[in-house]
Amino acid sequence: MASLRLPAQLVTRGNLIHHNSSSSSSGRLSWRRSLTPENTIPLFPSSSSSSLNRERSIVVPVTCSAAAVNLAPGTPVRPTSILVVGATGTLGRQIVRRALDEGYDVRCLVRPRPAPADFLRDWGATVVNADLSKPETIPATLVGIHTVIDCATGRPEEPIKTVDWEGKVALIQCAKAMGIQKYVFYSIHNCDKHPEVPLMEIKYCTEKFLQESGLNHITIRLCGFMQGLIGQYAVPILEEKSVWGTDAPTRVAYMDTQDIARLTLIALRNEKINGKLLTFAGPRAWTTQEVITLCERLAGQDANVTTVPVSVLRVTRQLTRFFQWTNDVADRLAFSEVLSSDTVFSAPMTETNSLLGVDQKDMVTLEKYLQDYFSNILKKLKDLKAQSKQSDIYF
């Protein structure tokens, strides 16, 4: 099997081009150039390439092939073997749990961290340490794997390109070189319509890169997670802290990550879905104000809402562009601006449900999800208050 070569733009940040732009544009991504042999650099350490490596700050070279990790040709791989990348995240952990419940052999790729992901081992998964920002750590994690489910995303303090573009390109190329049978990639709904937003452009370019890689794959675009609303609205309201909203009528069809995991594994078993682009959306699209109002009703108390006009986000984004050290902040503000514009992040699920053989009535609604959360948390708070009163004994 041929050794893998990483695209040159992974290490030369200034020469990237936009997927719809001419080659003279700068600062944009190019999924086509990633696939072009003349734009690749060897991953083998050699004396001739060492100076080039130093100039471009390339990570330690890595050979990505079956031979590189002592995988004998013809080694059988169980169809139930899955590698979940980003397994500790909001979606990743639900994928792991669902896959284990359905009898899959689950391996979890997680970054080395001071607090190990013991809960994944407790569930029955195997945990391996690797880092997408260090491509040389990837190949060993793919040995004996049939399917990769990619839930990974960069940390807030990292440049968006580090994991979400450079790391994903390296992972996809390693998967191709090592004969992975299927690759599931999660993207963002409408990412193809917002090339001005770095994160959405990256998602779209990764979709195209995966499509052209030749890997058997499924791409799933998502609108939003219900779980994210807990920290954003539910908890601050209960703690009588400010919640942040905008004056825009953006609507998002939030979906329970447990439903996303369930539908993903159904899609995984359906060979007719190979190579398809699916969009998963919740039963209804909600505005920020509607979500806040629902939380207020379920919590039984009013929210302290701080409204940020969309115009402020736009101005702030432009100001941060003046300073190199704030570029990543500006990238994230660009995404926030899209979320705060007059946009609907939703899609009809009729065709997808029919393809997967699922019933829309089985999907968790946002009302049900938040009602369960507030019921549980308010009961716990009530019990804690009762215990506190019982312990208040004065002499």
Swiss-Prot record:
Instruction: Look up the record and report any one GO term of the cellular component aspect.
Output: photosystem II
Q: Where is the transit peptide?
A: 1-64
Domain of life of the organism in this record?
Eukaryota
Instruction: Write the record's keywords in alphabetical order, separated by commas.
Output: Chloroplast, Membrane, Photosynthesis, Photosystem II, Plastid, Thylakoid, Transit peptide
Record Gene3D superfamilies = NAD(P)-binding Rossmann-like Domain (3.40.50.720)
Q: How does it sit in the membrane?
A: Peripheral membrane protein
Offer an example of a GO molecular function term for this protein.
translation initiation factor activity
Instruction: Please list which residues make up the signal peptide.
Output: none
What this protein is reported to do is described as: Auxiliary factor required, together with HCF173, for the biogenesis of photosystem II (PSII), especially for the synthesis of the reaction center proteins (e.g. D1), via the regulation of the corresponding mRNA (e.g. psbA) translation initiation (ribosomal loading) and stabilization. Forms a trimeric complex with OHP1 and OHP2 that is required to promote PSII core subunit assembly. The trimeric complex forms a transient PSII reaction center-like complex with PsbA, PsbD, PsbE, PsbF and PsbI subunits in thylakoids for early assembly of PSII as well as PSII repair.
- Cite the InterPro entries for this sequence: HCF244-like, NAD(P)-bd_dom_sf, NmrA-like
Subunit (UniProt): Component of a high molecular weight complex containing OHP1, OHP2 and HCF244, and PSII core proteins D1/D2, HCF136 and HCF173. Interacts with OHP1. Forms a trimeric complex with OHP1 and OHP2 that mutually stabilizes each subunit.
By sequence similarity, the record places it as follows: Belongs to the NmrA-type oxidoreductase family.
**Null-mutant phenotype, please?**
Impaired photoautotrophy. Seedling lethal. High chlorophyll fluorescence phenotype and severely affected photosystem II (PSII) subunits accumulation associated with a drastically decreased synthesis of the reaction center protein D1 due to a reduced translation initiation (ribosomal loading) of the corresponding psbA mRNA. Plants lacking both HCF173 and HCF244 display stronger PSII defects.
Name its species: Arabidopsis thaliana (Mouse-ear cress)
Q: Give one GO biological process term.
A: photosystem II assembly
Q: What is this protein called?
A: Protein HIGH CHLOROPHYLL FLUORESCENCE PHENOTYPE 244, chloroplastic
Q: Where in the cell is it found?
A: Plastid, Chloroplast stroma; Plastid, Chloroplast thylakoid membrane
PANTHER family listed in its UniProt record? PROTEIN HIGH CHLOROPHYLL FLUORESCENCE PHENOTYPE 244, CHLOROPLASTIC, PTHR47128
